[in-house]
């Protein structure tokens, strides 16, 4: 089904959790609901094992990038901080592979979208 929203951005986020901390999709959902969202604000979540969890339908506006939500797709990967809490690329090989595959598919669906993150 074609998305009725005009998507011109695909935004990649991290969960801003430490590399040695597990943050499963259930924890992400609880965190977002505690912030007042009706569900996870991202459209996709990628855990350390490379599993891609669809979270919000693409035709639904996300809650991940203020002022850009109406025309973007949001992806989040688990991690993003080293053991000391400093920003770091903590993506596992499985996450990198899954992210690449997901971005490829989304780029086919939204060929004019810019990828940020």
Regions found by a protein language model. Give the residues of each.
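Active-site-adjacent loop/helix surface patches within enzyme catalytic domains
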Residues: 1-115
């Amino acid at each position: 089904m074609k998305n009725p929203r005009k998507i011109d951005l695909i935004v990649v986020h991290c969960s801003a959790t430490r590399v040695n901390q597990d943050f499963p999709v259930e924890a992400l959902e609880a965190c977002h609901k505690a912030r007042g969202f009706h569900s996870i604000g991202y459209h996709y979540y990628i855990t350390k094992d490379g599993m891609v969890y669809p979270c919000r339908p693409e035709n639904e506006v996300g809650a991940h990038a203020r002022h850009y939500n109406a025309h973007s797709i949001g992806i989040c990967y688990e991690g993003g901080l080293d053991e000391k809490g400093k920003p770091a690329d903590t993506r596992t090989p499985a996450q990198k592979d899954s992210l690449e595959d997901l971005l490829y598919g989304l780029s086919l669906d939204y060929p004019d979208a810019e990828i940020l993150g």
